Amino acid sequence: MSGVSEPLSRVKLGTLRRPEGPAEPMVVVPVDVEKEDVRILKVCFYSNSFNPGKNFKLVKCTVQTEIREIITSILLSGRIGPNIRLAECYGLRLKHMKSDEIHWLHPQMTVGEVQDKYECLHVEAEWRYDLQIRYLPEDFMESLKEDRTTLLYFYQQLRNDYMQRYASKVSEGMALQLGCLELRRFFKDMPHNALDKKSNFELLEKEVGLDLFFPKQMQENLKPKQFRKMIQQTFQQYASLREEECVMKFFNTLAGFANIDQETYRCELIQGWNITVDLVIGPKGIRQLTSQDAKPTCLAEFKQIRSIRCLPLEEGQAVLQLGIEGAPQALSIKTSSLAEAENMADLIDGYCRLQGEHQGSLIIHPRKDGEKRNSLPQIPMLNLEARRSHLSESCSIESDIYAEIPDETLRRPGGPQYGIAREDVVLNRILGEGFFGEVYEGVYTNHKGEKINVAVKTCKKDCTLDNKEKFMSEAVIMKNLDHPHIVKLIGIIEEEPTWIIMELYPYGELGHYLERNKNSLKVLTLVLYSLQICKAMAYLESINCVHRDIAVRNILVASPECVKLGDFGLSRYIEDEDYYKASVTRLPIKWMSPESINFRRFTTASDVWMFAVCMWEILSFGKQPFFWLENKDVIGVLEKGDRLPKPDLCPPVLYTLMTRCWDYDPSDRPRFTELVCSLSDVYQMEKDIAMEQERNARYRTPKILEPTAFQEPPPKPSRPKYRPPPQTNLLAPKLQFQVPEGLCASSPTLTSPMEYPSPVNSLHTPPLHRHNVFKRHSMREEDFIQPSSREEAQQLWEAEKVKMRQILDKQQKQMVEDYQWLRQEEKSLDPMVYMNDKSPLTPEKEVGYLEFTGPPQKPPRLGAQSIQPTANLDRTDDLVYLNVMELVRAVLELKNELCQLPPEGYVVVVKNVGLTLRKLIGSVDDLLPSLPSSSRTEIEGTQKLLNKDLAELINKMRLAQQNAVTSLSEECKRQMLTASHTLAVDAKNLLDAVDQAKVLANLAHPPAE
């Protein structure tokens, strides 16, 4: 390939034609450029070709090459089609394949800037450059008719988005229409009745595939014959359409379901207060949508925009400011991330170039430090007398030399006014006494004449100026807060005596409410309270505010289903630093994190610690944390690694979440946004459990007494084994899934050799078929004895009956002998050998037995975990033992079903394991008071270990879901199985610890003979 004669930056973006001759245009690379600065970008685009090699183009460029030069190079190459008239509609998208992270690249960006800003965030091979049509003319359907290449490219792009995002959501009728339109367009030369022939339709199914045209879900829901007939009938409606007509019909049909010519962003408009809206950006301008049923409201047209600016905020958020002609102030839009703001800025700037008269960019980039020093903000022009009055008011009482110059830019005249008249508030009874003064119940009459029940915090008259400022600091913070689970501030009276008026909640403090109603409150409600407070803390986290006093005494109950966080007396903003260092003041030591106790350092991470302690209070029905310790001893306990014990009713998953919040390293604690998601999952799980229990109680079926289930005799030791062909396994040769031998030894019916192969010979399991096990000889017709009379027939029937009774007696006797042999061998054999015995339960032939001379030799096990057999005790009414059995069954079910389940189905089997573990720990907690105190430490430690095992299993499950479509899928599944096996082993260890404690307490009994 050779370069064009002049740089592509000089080529006008008008009608682009492919140059004459075989040469293909490329970005010009100067001769003196070093090799390190030269790059080859692989840019993908859409086409009709099934050949992946024709759907991308390699572009050679340098780090100084601009994105618009790369776009122009592809359009000039003719790879997507000839005679492109609407080159301004195209843009370049950078997409991360694993996380779906998207960055729209501005035409003026250079390759080096893209590399430094975006590509360095992930591995280079995980990024993909896509050529997309992003900016559409106002009447795009008519405009695209003049540019056939752009029309077909936009159709391919839109159809690709439809198959990936909308195909499974539209109705069957619409999916059928859109699929037949593509079928007609794709096979434009096919006769209208071609699909009526069965051979043609089968050729379409086998050679091309219906997945290219119709969603897979639709094909699975319909019968093949019915689906074929529907396609034939619908295709007849579009058989006479030409290619362009099919495209236009596709646009019009899909437009009834999705917006094909605009992009929608969920963001907040900053207009004195924040309004959450859907911002719609398309050819008609920038519009806002407050609800799905409402009509969009126009905020600005692209011709009115004069500047675009992106400003980063804390916690990854950003503000997009649009300077609009004739508007007194910029339109400010708050987004969840800087990348989203930049994508919106590129979209708006592209439409301004397309519809405006200028070709330049309206985006104003942040200035460098040197530029900032050369430009100072304008001095505010205030009235001289006003400035003098401010200076006189701000003078210090003790000095006439220093004065504070007020910052006029911080004044917000448009904000809500919280000053109210004292005569509008009537005080009633005293609710309690705080650090600064009494708290009263009262009634406030607003300007509309409405009476509102309020709580009034008062400040003592003899309070010092410093304490008064601390008292008022709570109101200063609360007036900026607006959240459904944060106490609402009504107003402030700053004159002496100072009052802070807040909403009154009739149920009072959460701590007292929990104590009064602990017999009626359910775990589901307690988890709901924790979730609501977590949402409030996530809101405080988003505005860089630390609370520093999260406890049930500072939470008010608005209703039995709603709580609100209050008491912001210790709250502080952390704007300049990421932490707040407290001065000498009274602090809640038993709720605080180690770094807060040691260094008076308060961050969002320390609030996470306190929130977990508050959750512990809620699940303990208002008990004070570390009530058995004095304040001075708390830090020593925390430094040793001890934490608050699990409350009795606390779900294991929730306690695991608490322990994560109590990590000594603040950086390892989860953020509140993550905790909201985790608590939502726990709440949904508890809700499902409650609904299931209610359903079982409502529709409980009567118990039916059934006879004891017949169990087949266990395999005898002398039966020979065979070696069939190897059996494939999800675990692969690298990972062997082991069932604890002790569990199998103490419960032979837990797992049968036929169903769960052991790791020793799981690759050599004999195929066991029911028709082979219970095989009997057939008889010819002449073998039957023909009775000559009715009496003879009766005698033959009696003889057959006696014979069958003898056979049954013999089998029953053998079964008793086999059972006695099994109980004897359990004591001498290694339990794993019994579990791994793969001999069939009943051989095909009862001959050829080898003489039994002793127990079979234990096969070698490399790297297996040594597990002692479980104690041989009486397991009647032993709930711990039964729950351990259930847990192992749940783990085995996970192991067997993991390879068949889709990624979203992993949650079901893991949830089953979690629920079973919860029952196990609950049964241990019920038994714990009757066990010796010397054994409780080991049992509680094993319980904590099981909670950590479950958390690890959940983490591995999420990892497996994230990598379901990558090459790491099998490895993640193996890690998930390893975590589940560890959980089963630790459950067996818990059973052993409980058995030992029961023996010490004389609660264990040998099994009855």
UniProtKB/Swiss-Prot annotation:
Name of a matching Pfam family: Focal_AT
Active site: D549
Tissue: Most abundant in the brain, with highest levels in amygdala and hippocampus. Low levels in kidney (at protein level). Also expressed in spleen and lymphocytes.
Catalytic activity, reaction form: L-tyrosyl-[protein] + ATP = O-phospho-L-tyrosyl-[protein] + ADP + H(+)
A GO-annotated cellular component: cytoplasm
S-S bonds: none
Effect upon mutating Y881F: Loss of phosphorylation site. Strongly reduced interaction with GRB2
Activity regulation as described: Activated in response to stimuli that lead to increased intracellular Ca(2+) levels; this activation is indirect and may be mediated by calcium-mediated production of reactive oxygen species (ROS). Activated by autophosphorylation at Tyr-402; this creates a binding site for SRC family kinases and leads to phosphorylation at additional tyrosine residues. Phosphorylation at Tyr-402, Tyr-579 and Tyr-580 is required for optimal kinase activity. Inhibited by PF-562,271, BIRB796, PF-4618433 and by PF-431396, PF-2318841 and their derivatives.
SMART domains: B41, TyrKc
UniProt record, GO biological process: activation of Janus kinase activity; adaptive immune response; apoptotic process; bone resorption; cell surface receptor signaling pathway; cellular defense response; cellular response to fluid shear stress; cellular response to retinoic acid
Region of interest called Disordered, as start-end residue ranges on this chain: 701-725
Chain positions found as Phosphoserine: S361, S375, S399, S762, S839, S866
Binding positions for ATP per the UniProt entry: 431-439, 457, 503-509
Job description of the protein: Non-receptor protein-tyrosine kinase that regulates reorganization of the actin cytoskeleton, cell polarization, cell migration, adhesion, spreading and bone remodeling. Plays a role in the regulation of the humoral immune response, and is required for normal levels of marginal B-cells in the spleen and normal migration of splenic B-cells. Required for normal macrophage polarization and migration towards sites of inflammation. Regulates cytoskeleton rearrangement and cell spreading in T-cells, and contributes to the regulation of T-cell responses.
Disease linkage: Aberrant PTK2B/PYK2 expression may play a role in cancer cell proliferation, migration and invasion, in tumor formation and metastasis. Elevated PTK2B/PYK2 expression is seen in gliomas, hepatocellular carcinoma, lung cancer and breast cancer.
Family designation: Belongs to the protein kinase superfamily. Tyr protein kinase family. FAK subfamily.
Miscellaneous: Promotes bone resorption, and thus PTK2B/PYK2 inhibitors might be used to treat osteoporosis.
PANTHER family linked to this entry: FERM AND PDZ DOMAIN-CONTAINING PROTEIN FAMILY MEMBER, NON-SPECIFIC PROTEIN-TYROSINE KINASE
Record-given protein name: Protein-tyrosine kinase 2-beta
Gene name in the database record: PTK2B
